[in-house]
Amino acid sequence: MTEHWHIKPFLFRQVFPNFEPLCDFDTIAEMASDEDIESRLIQHSKAGWTLEHGPFDALPSMKKKAWTVLIQGIDHHLPEAYDLLQLFRFIPDARLDDVMLSLASDGGGVGPHYDSYDVFLLQMHGKRRWKIGPLPNKELEEGMPLKILKNFEPTEEFVLEPGDMLYLPPNYGHDGVAEGTCSTLSIGFRAPTQAEVLSCILRDMADQIDQDPGMTQTLFSDPARGLQKNPAEIPDDLLNFGFNLIRQFSAKSPQIQRSMGILLTEPKTHVYFVNNTDDQEIHEIISVLGERGVALSMKTKMLFKDADFYINGDAVNPTSALTVKQLQMLANQREMEPIDAVEALKNPEFQYFLIGFAKAGWVETLM
């Protein structure tokens, strides 16, 4: 980690010996046809590059050269991909993003490009030739539907076979081309931008002012206002009204932490949960969860900091040390064996939270 993470590439040969594909062509085609799953079709010819967004009624024939379909977030839909992602939890969950699948015909790829985040490229089926290199120049081709590097000069080249994996740090150039039909898994890591963080913090601050009865909406006022010499000039006291508001929240780290927790667990656009509002059915589900164990949904993102918890964009604040311990177990293990679930459900506060999670569709039975 200290030598390569965020610093330089590393090639793992046969990190997964005898690696078996997580799914077949029919499953990939089915995911590409699902409107709730993000997919893209990229094709390359003498005329240039084309990009189409799914869902797709059908994929091109594998006999046709130089096309690639990308399926985002397959760990939300395939238990095998979900289990694979768990192997990468040596990095904090807050940084884990998802598993993307790339199926390509001979010659297929997405062109020379770079990612702004760390990525592991795991070969699932067939062979892919990777050309990689540092980027002294990030200039992109103009008029392209994809972000393709204009002057990419690779310094290394590898052919990956099933079970091989290539790690690339952020902003490192790479170009992968299929040699025959192949499929590759990309395990990506989230890197929120400053704009995302600031936007979420400010939005959450505004929500807190609206919802917290202890925080009253204060309008700007200027009872001592004198005559304005320059009518178009913004008054200093009005600017200070804004500055002081930001300072007020900046001094309250728990509120900043809350905003970050919400941002880091907020579901993506294509992630949906099925709500359950039938109280009788919910109590039956809770009973079953006690008997069969509890597991977070494959789509659920749950994080915590000390005694504060964040799940799928919501903040959860338990009051008892026991509940904190039980929720930390659920977040860290992403599941509870029946023996632990039965014991935890004896705690009314934990049961209260679990009922809320079950209603939102965020948990399911373990067995």
Stretches found by the model and what they are:
Residues R203-T265:
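Long, charge-rich alpha-helical interaction segments
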Residues A251-L330, I355, M367:
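Acidic, low-complexity/disordered tracts enriched in E/D and polar residues
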Residues I7, P318-M367:
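Long, charge-rich, low-complexity alpha-helical segments
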Residues Q43-H44, R258-M260, V342:
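Short coil/turn segments at secondary-structure boundaries
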Residues M1-H4, F16-D164, Y172-D222, E364:
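Active-site region of the double-stranded beta-helix
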